[in-house]
């Protein structure tokens, strides 16, 4: 197993490891704008409606693919797998959905909030944008998240039909994405 590229985002910085990029940013909307079209090749459908973890996941994957020199294009499919994890699952999205449900008299909540109540939704949004057709898996671990998710991704590389897997650990404080081959 080899790490071909790494993209990362903290609360005010982003970067790529192999290309030795490290820059500041103000917010995710401005980061999204400044990465187009060099790193984010074409607009991400519904990006402004994404929850925070979906934005972090998608942008970090773009950074990691750029770092790994893997190109993607609109409509182009690639057999690349996607494994994701984080420390809270979809807790923030579930809380936002429930608050919206309460605010609407316990009868309705907005559907655009519901989709992100599943912890695999950020991965699915990214897979759609980048045309990834390999296996998609969300993992939840109580301890050793980095080590256990890396072990799982490596095991998948050994037995799956894909030669490349993207591993994302998405958290609001720090998101790191690695392209494994």
Task: List each model region and its residues.
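Conserved "HGTGT" condensation-loop signature of ketosynthase/thiolase-family condensing enzymes
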Residues: 1-181
């Amino acid at each position: 197993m080899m790490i071909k590229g790494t993209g990362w985002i903290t609360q005010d910085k982003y970067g790529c490891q192999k290309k030795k990029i490290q820059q500041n940013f103000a917010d995710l909307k401005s980061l999204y704008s400044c990465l187009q079209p060099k790193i984010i090749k074409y607009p991400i459908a519904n990006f402004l409606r994404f929850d925070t973890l979906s934005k972090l996941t998608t942008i970090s994957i773009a950074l990691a693919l750029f770092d790994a020199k893997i190109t993607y294009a609109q409509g182009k499919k690639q057999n690349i797998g996607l494994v994701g994890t984080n420390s809270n699952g979809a807790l923030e999205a579930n809380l936002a959905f429930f608050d919206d449900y309460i605010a609407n008299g316990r009868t309705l909540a907005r559907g655009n909030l519901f989709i992100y109540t599943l912890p695999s939704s950020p991965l699915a949004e990214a897979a759609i944008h980048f045309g990834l057709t390999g296996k998609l898996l969300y993992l939840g671990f109580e301890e050793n998240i980095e080590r256990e998710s890396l072990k799982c991704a490596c095991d998948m590389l050994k037995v799956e039909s894909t030669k490349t897997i993207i591993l994302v650990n998405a958290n609001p404080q720090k998101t790191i994405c690695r392209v494994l081959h």
